[in-house]
């Protein structure tokens, strides 16, 4: 019972980590969209390794799911609904998430600086 309670408590943190990794991957892919190959510093990055491992893990599942649900997607009414939903809610999800992450970071830094003693952080305000 205790193990189940701890795993349920860890679930939101795991979801947050997956969301952050997905956002980082989306931001990196948008930044290097026009370049033929990533720069050398990205090739050596640990984040690039995490991104490639996640892609290895998720790509087959996404492909299998897409193949299994292809019959449903072929229905024109559902396709129209899904396209409208995507256009209304999901098209700009990457930039919105990136903006939210930057605002959250700025807010956290401001709160941290407000708690910092003036002697140490006076020049950073």
Curated annotation (Swiss-Prot):
Keywords recorded for this protein, A-Z: Lipid transport, Secreted, Signal, Transport
Subcellular locations according to the entry: Secreted
Signal peptide residue numbers: 1-27
Name used for this protein in its record: Apolipoprotein C-IV
Record keyword Signal present: yes
Pfam families in UniProt: APOC4 (PF15119)
Gene name, Swiss-Prot/TrEMBL: APOC4
Broad class of the protein's primary localization: secreted
PANTHER family: APOLIPOPROTEIN C-IV (PTHR32288:SF0)
Lineage: Eukaryota, Metazoa, Chordata, Craniata, Vertebrata
Gene Ontology CC: high-density lipoprotein particle; very-low-density lipoprotein particle
Family: Belongs to the apolipoprotein C4 family.
Tagged with keyword rRNA processing: no
Chain's role: May participate in lipoprotein metabolism.
Gene Ontology biological process terms in this record: lipid transport; positive regulation of triglyceride storage; triglyceride homeostasis
């Amino acid at each position: 019972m205790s193990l189940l309670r701890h795993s349920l408590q860890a679930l939101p943190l795991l979801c947050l980590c997956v969301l952050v990794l997905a956002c980082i991957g989306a931001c990196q892919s948008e930044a290097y969209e026009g370049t033929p190959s990533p720069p050398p510093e990205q090739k050596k990055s640990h984040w690039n390794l995490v991104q490639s491992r996640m892609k290895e893990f998720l790509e087959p599942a996404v492909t299998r799911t897409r193949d299994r649900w292809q019959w449903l997607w072929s229905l024109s009414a559902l396709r129209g609904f899904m396209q409208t939903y995507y256009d209304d809610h999901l098209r700009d999800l990457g930039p919105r998430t990136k903006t939210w992450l930057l605002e959250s970071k700025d807010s956290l830094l401001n709160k941290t600086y407000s708690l910092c003693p003036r002697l140490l952080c006076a020049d950073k305000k």
